[in-house]
């Protein structure tokens, strides 16, 4: 099957298709009579409202209200009418370069919500977080905006400023941000490095046109350095181009194996994508890390490798974005975007979560503890992989080893809640401190230690910047502060890969994956080790 190139924009897939007329001709005569009867009743209601409603309404306004109500009642946030300028924006999104702040967004509960700030972008540096609801852009409320409207407002010329306010869980007041737009270029694989024990680490943060080539080069580089297995980290990957998701999975699957299927009411929407080449890294053990920010194309890759027993999936349940949208042309250069199909993994699991069920967003700094997938609270349908292993359905990709977030200490939570009230003021002060520290410490090395003296100096820098924090809370949250400082000083000096490598040193999910890979020689031995690991963590029956 040939899958046309598509882009998630943001986190929605647009498979461009030409619509055809003759809708009435495709229906039976009886249905046509009912349609005309309903149309006459609709026109009668509209005319009487236009003539008699206490507040004057123009017919065009009433038609628009009816159209919006019809689409709203479908219960599908991705089905909508796009005017010509919206369609032009959608085409712009396929070009891969634009002036913006670098965040992936979706519409949830009537508000534009941050799914993921992209690494190295103004949005990430400003401190935007997954789960933030953008409630204002340049003084305009975003209530009931669709994603296309939000994209048009958030994007703009390089160097221009956008002012936003976000609502964040645990913070009483909206948080203001003032962010300077930059030209956004997304590097698909920002981090590739060797860990101890001949284990490689690769992080992929998007599925762009270069994703497959970047990942192939990264795996080849790691193997040349002696890697006997690798971690593929998709935890911060909100998706991207569908065809790149298919080709990334193709790197590790055998020719002819199913990657993903689409199923809809119309026959042409029922398609199957298969691997076109042989496994390019046969026998190479692979652990895929996923989480609530892993979406769409990232879920296709994780699901395909899991179903074919090619990779062990570790982490938390993914976002669950698995629907296909098709564009149909309307009059006056308008377009109808319709959800026409859903994605299914090779064993038949639907990737799409039911609307209204949101993936939980972990609190920054939470540490996971492993639990077997069977211990998840709600019951989910079971499926069998190619070798007979049990995997769970119900929307999203459920890992083979599920991690549950541990909590920050109460003082750390209180400190973070206080910081969030200051919006980007904290991140601005942190960046200034990092720049100043690097200027006065020219011989610094990547493995530097953050000392208590540095933490004390940072506290005074916050006070001078107008970020008022309680000193006692600050001292009791010093573990978090020191990790945060270490990450951002590293980021400022050596870039994303060095910062990610430092963060991974304290990441229990990465440590868990690496420990499993060190004992594995083949994908099959990796599954055996994981099963033993899960059995040790399972609760024992009570006598």
What are these regions, as identified by a protein language model?
Residues 1-4:
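Short, Lys/Arg-rich N-terminal segment immediately upstream of the first membrane anchor
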Residues 8-23:
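Hydrophobic membrane-insertion alpha-helices, especially the h-region
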Residues 23-38, 50-54, 58-59, 113-130, ...:
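Cleft-lining beta-strand/loop regions that shape enzyme active-site pockets
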Residues 38-45, 62-70, 86, 110, ...:
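Stable alpha-helical elements in mature extracytoplasmic
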Residues 45, 66, 103, 164, ...:
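Residue-level signature of catalytic and energy-coupling elements of molecular machines
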Residues 53-115, 161-191, 260, 504-514, ...:
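Extended, small/polar residue-biased N-terminal targeting/export presequences
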Residues 297, 309, 316, 320-381:
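Polar, glycine-rich mid-to-C-terminal structural blocks
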Residues 350-351, 355-543:
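Conserved functional hotspot residues or short segments at active or partner-binding sites
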């Amino acid at each position: 099957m040939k899958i046309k190139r598509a882009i998630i924009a943001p986190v929605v897939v647009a498979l461009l298709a030409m619509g055809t007329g003759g809708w009435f001709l495709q229906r039976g005569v009886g249905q046509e009579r009912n349609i005309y009867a309903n149309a006459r009743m609709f026109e009668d209601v509209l005319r009487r409202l236009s003539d008699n409603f206490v507040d004057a309404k123009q017919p065009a306004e009433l038609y628009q209200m009816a159209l919006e109500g019809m689409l709203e009642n479908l219960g599908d946030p991705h089905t909508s009418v796009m005017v010509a300028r919206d369609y032009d924006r959608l085409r712009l999104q396929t070009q891969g370069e634009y002036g913006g702040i670098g965040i992936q967004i979706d519409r949830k509960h009537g508000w534009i919500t941050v799914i993921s700030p992209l690494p190295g972008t103004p949005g990430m540096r400003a401190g935007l977080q997954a789960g933030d609801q953008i409630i204002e852009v340049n003084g305009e409320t975003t209530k009931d905006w669709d994603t296309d409207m939000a994209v048009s407002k958030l994007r703009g010329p390089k160097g221009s400023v956008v002012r936003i306010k976000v609502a964040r869980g645990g913070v009483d007041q909206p948080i203001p941000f003032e962010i300077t737009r930059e030209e956004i270029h997304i590097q698909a694989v920002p981090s590739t490095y060797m860990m101890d024990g001949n284990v490689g680490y690769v992080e992929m943060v998007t599925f762009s046109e270069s994703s497959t080539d970047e990942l192939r080069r990264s795996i080849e580089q790691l193997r040349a350095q002696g890697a006997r297995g690798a971690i593929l980290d998709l935890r911060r990957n909100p998706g991207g181009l569908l065809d790149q998701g298919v080709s990334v999975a193709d790197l590790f699957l055998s020719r002819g194996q199913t990657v993903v299927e689409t199923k809809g009411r119309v026959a042409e929407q029922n398609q199957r994508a298969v691997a076109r080449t042989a496994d390019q890294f046969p026998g190479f053990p692979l652990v895929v890390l996923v989480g609530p920010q892993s979406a769409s194309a990232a879920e296709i890759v994780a699901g395909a490798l899991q179903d074919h027993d090619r990779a062990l999936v570790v982490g938390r349940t993914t976002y669950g974005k698995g629907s296909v949208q098709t564009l149909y042309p309307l009059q006056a250069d308008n377009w109808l975007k319709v959800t026409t199909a859903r994605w299914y993994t090779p064993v038949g699991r639907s990737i799409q979560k039911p609307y209204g069920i949101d993936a939980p967003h972990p609190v920054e700094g939470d540490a996971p503890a492993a639990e077997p997938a069977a211990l998840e609270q709600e019951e989910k349908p079971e499926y069998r992989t190619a070798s007979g292993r049990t995997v769970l359905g119900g929307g999203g990709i459920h890992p083979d080893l599920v991690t549950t977030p541990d909590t920050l200490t109460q003082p750390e939570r209180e400190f973070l809640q206080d910081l969030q009230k200051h919006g980007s003021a904290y991140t601005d002060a942190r960046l200034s401190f990092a720049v100043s520290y690097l200027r006065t410490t020219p011989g610094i090395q990547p493995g530097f230690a953050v000392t208590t003296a540095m933490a004390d100096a940072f506290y005074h820098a916050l006070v001078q910047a107008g970020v008022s924090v309680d000193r006692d809370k600050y001292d009791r949250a010093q573990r978090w502060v020191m990790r945060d400082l270490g990450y951002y000083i590293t980021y400022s000096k050596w870039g994303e890969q060095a910062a990610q490598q430092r963060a991974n040193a304290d990441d229990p999910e990465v440590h868990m994956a690496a420990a499993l890979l060190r004992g594995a020689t083949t994908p099959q031995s990796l599954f055996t080790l994981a099963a033993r690991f899960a059995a040790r963590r399972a609760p024992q029956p009570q006598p």
